[in-house]
Design a protein with these regions (language model features):
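Bacterial N-terminal signal peptides
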Residues: 9-15
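Tryptophan-anchored aromatic micro-motifs
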Residues: 26-39, 256-276, 320-322, 367
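Boundary regions of SH3-family modules and the immediately adjacent low-complexity/disordered segments
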Residues: 36, 66-108, 157-186, 229-257
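SH3/SH3-like beta-barrel superfamily modules
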Residues: 47-70, 81, 136-170, 210-244
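N-terminal glycine/threonine-rich, aromatic-flanked beta-hairpin/loop signature
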Residues: 104, 270-332, 343, 357-361
């Protein structure tokens, strides 16, 4: 552990661009350079993974093309080496959680000031857990950052002391405008998991994972943390941050639902989320077809089916599953790219009139079976 931290600090102290970009890295080392006007990590070695930032695609990837899904280059201050994926399996797990949380919007960051001293709760509920022996509060005179609003509550980040931050809820919606969309993903916590109200500095354990029930992910905070809600042993509600690496999705494949939608489908209306024409095979393999502009405009594939000018795309091969649904849907559809390790998750529904619908956030598209 000390060796990894020392290697990180040593790399951080190097002059920007001092290391050779293609030079092999050892576990725990990084390269730092300027990206879009800020210091960011351009290469990270973690366990068996060496991830290099590609400005053209705005992603991190291994030499053989495995992508780690993040929102662009990691700024210098956000990297948390102890929470990095260290194996291919862990990276794929992070990508799956990233896809599962796409219904949720990001956090805001708006500075707020004032004169009030406000009680701070761990959830937007007067009966939820309250830190500091039930006395946690924030003085707006000292400054705070508004992260989101939920009903008539506001989530704020503030400094407790020089080595401790806290993120919690205050019962007011007058601090600014920070609307968000939250999701609701049931998960299981792995051994050693914990929830914290300080994901940036102290990682103070508000609760240990094995003391929590009904854990559900609400949003992704950054590449290393998810925002979650849970219930404590005494029934108290608790919201906080959990490391992505300590979360396991509770997905169960629905073989009957997969059998019901196997076949070839063509786009017929709404948002074109899944490509124009694709085939879902019963073994979980799938393929998208490259079709001509004329076929796109006329949608003749809906009556003629696959014709000579509609060829399977080698880059359009994918794996697919149907699992239990989230956010009120009966089923979710997971599309996985086996070549780069990324995946996309949609809510899915087979309508009474035979259309297959895919939905994500506020977008949706419909497909019909084709000959």
């Amino acid at each position: 552990m000390k060796k990894r931290i020392f290697a990180l600090l040593l790399a951080a102290m190097l002059p920007l661009g001092a290391a050779i970009a293609d030079e092999p890295l050892t576990d725990g080392t990084v390269l730092v350079d300027w990206v879009d006007g800020q210091e960011a990590y351009t290469a990270i070695c973690s366990g068996e993974l060496t991830l290099r930032y590609d400005a053209d695609t705005n992603t991190y990837a291994t030499a053989d093309g495995l992508i780690w899904k993040t929102e662009g280059a990691l700024p210098f201050a956000t990297y948390q080496p102890l929470l990095m994926p260290r194996t291919r399996e862990e990276l794929l797990q992070c990508n799956a959680i990233y896809a599962a949380l796409q219904d949720a919007s990001g956090f805001w960051s708006e500075k707020v000031t004032g004169t009030e001293v406000l009680p701070v709760c761990a959830a937007p509920d007067e009966n939820s857990y309250r830190a500091s022996n039930g006395k946690a509060s924030v003085s707006l005179a000292g400054g705070a950052t508004l992260l989101m609003q939920y009903g008539d509550w506001s989530l704020v980040r503030y400094e407790v002391n020089s080595s401790r931050m806290r993120i919690g809820w205050v019962h007011t919606n007058q601090l600014g405008s920070a609307p968000v969309m939250l999701t609701d993903i049931p998960v299981t916590l792995k051994d050693g998991a914990f929830l914290t109200d300080d994901p940036a500095t102290s990682w103070y354990h508000t609760a240990e994972g094995d003391t929590l029930t009904d854990v559900r992910l609400l949003a992704q905070y950054d590449p290393f943390w998810a925002y979650a809600r849970a219930t404590m042993q005494d029934g108290t509600i608790l919201w906080g941050f959990v490391p992505l690496m300590s979360v396991q999705l509770n997905d169960t494949v629905d073989a009957e639902a997969m059998a019901n939608v196997s076949g070839t489908w063509g786009f017929c209306g709404g948002g074109e989320l899944m490509g124009w024409v694709f085939t879902l095979m019963a073994d979980g393999q799938g393929v998208c077809y490259a079709i001509s502009d004329e076929a796109l405009e006329s949608m003749r594939y809906l009556t003629e089916g696959i014709t000579a000018d509609m060829n399977p795309e080698s880059a359009g091969m994918f794996q697919w599953q149907i699992v239990g649904g989230t956010n009120g849907y009966a089923h979710d559809f997971i599309l996985s790219n086996t070549s780069n390790g990324t995946c996309v998750r949609y809510h899915a529904a087979l309508t009474e009139d035979g259309y297959l619908g895919f939905y994500q956030c506020e977008a949706g598209g419909h497909y019909q079976r084709i000959p």
